[in-house]
Amino acid sequence: SYLYFLDNDVWYRGLMRRHDKGYATIIINFDSFGQCISESYFDASDHAVCCLDEEDGAELCARIEYDYDEYGNTAGIRYKNVSGNMMIHRDWGYAQVRNEHDGQGNLTEQRHYDANNEPIARPGGFFSVSWFYDNGNCTETRYYDAEKELMMRSDENYAIQKDQYDEYGRSILSTYCNTEGEPVINTVYGCAGFEYKYDQWGNETDIIYRDTEGDMMVRERLGFAWIKMEYDEWGRLEVKKYFDAEQNPTADLKGCAEIRYEYDEQGIQHERAFDLNGTELQ
């Protein structure tokens, strides 16, 4: 079969190499269980090429290979170049990943390796990650160095993320901790934790930012400590309001204190922003 495509205002019939992705053909292979075991990229002349990042054009990889355990869980992923050798994937920072799963299929450990099968650090400095579960919900995420010792992520300043859930399995509290399990400020988010609340219909009504003592705190990059949301009878978001650490109405860094959502006959959402005085912002 052929594709018709336009290139520099000229129509062509046949395969073409996509300028944004760097390839013309993807070949995907499966094992006898229907599991994808490889994905390879080629140009219009069937030569192996690396797929490209659509934004900056950087080469990512020419082939991805997958391994599975006896239960069908993804046990390993390898990235390869046009010569068939393992290469560091630009976005992930490693050439190979190896996974472990529990009896329920939950991912419990992930280790990262370079093109020579040596352990390699991810951005943030960690070499491996472990996850712990309760009734299928991930309750802890831990980051380790090359010696499998807990370590502080250099990019976000925490070693452990602890998560709590309600009886319906909804997240109600996420907390960032050091290697001793004590709360610390995540330097990306600018807080030590997130608290979530829901109404009787399951709509998320509150997002609260917590400090290391568990108190409400203002995230400096946002200008508020608490988001309060209201919904209509169809579960559509109607109002979003911001509050400070003393639970007083406040505005974000752009002066917006409240957002009202309206819906037209087609159900398309429209937003209107207001300041603390109730004046609509343009």
Task: Write out the residue ranges for each language-model feature.
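Buried hydrophobic residues that stabilize the cores of well-folded domains
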Residues: S1-Q282
